[in-house]
Swiss-Prot record:
Protein name: tRNA-cytidine(32) 2-sulfurtransferase
Subunit and interaction comment: Homodimer.
Sequence positions that bind [4Fe-4S] cluster: 111, 114, 202
Organism: Anaeromyxobacter dehalogenans (strain 2CP-1 / ATCC BAA-258)
Cofactor(s) annotated in UniProt: Mg(2+); [4Fe-4S] cluster
Name of the encoding gene: ttcA
NCBIfam families given in the database record: PRK10696.1
Top-rank EC class of the record's enzyme: transferase
Amino acid sequence: MQQIHRLERKLLRATAEAIRDFDLVSQGDRIMVAVSGGKDSYTLLHLLMRLRERAPIDFDLVAVNLDQGQPGFPAQVVEDHLRSVGVPYRMLQRDTYSVVRRLVPEGKTTCPVCSRLRRGVLYNAAVEMGCTKIALGHHRDDLVETLLLSALYSGALKSMPPKLRSRDGRNVVVRPLCYAAEEDVAAFAEAMRFPIVPCDLCGSQPNLRRKRVKRLLAELSAEHPAVKGNLLHALAHVVPSHLLDRDLHRQLADATGRDPWLDAEDEEAEDCGEPPAGDGVVSLGGARGGR
């Protein structure tokens, strides 16, 4: 029980900090919490329910689970949990599984297509239900893995934003767990004995690139525990004068009337390998530093 309280306090602090830093929850919000049956979404729902009890603003939560037609998906397990915690919920059924199987060649990972179809269903449901925001369970590790995936395999410096507006402008997606470490989420979910639904029911091939990046981060973290926290910290401490983006350079030059590159300090000889000082929490304001 002591471990549960310790982990809950830590995760509540990280979640509340992210909500404050990025204005993720507002007065009167009706927030759809996408609950897949995995550790991340169960934990997100629990934390938002706890924060709602003590928040100085009023907001509503509705949990939504989507059964996409994967063989053996235990929708009743998820529904029983949602009923037991006393949150309003909706169980949706859309056979996107057969669509994915038709579109994706045998042996290829189905995750990207499946994700887009799932997102479309949730977006439409949020509008129909009058939800102002959709909360997803992506955590710190998801953000830093995506940062490396984008840089290494796509040649772009980007990750998952803490909030975004959908392309059609109808939905706002928020990620309140963006400061939370995956190992804390996993430990909390295990301690709480959430009824976890496996994510491989569809039989899809694993995302090998993401798994490779995850292994790389694990190896680096074994040598330098602050690696993941530092990468998250880097996402909020961009130094434009030390990058090669000419469009960004032009925007800054137009805004300031100065050439950012000529104003850059010579930092090439500096040792950038030291972890942040303190107890492992670095304000972005807010993002978590080394663990």
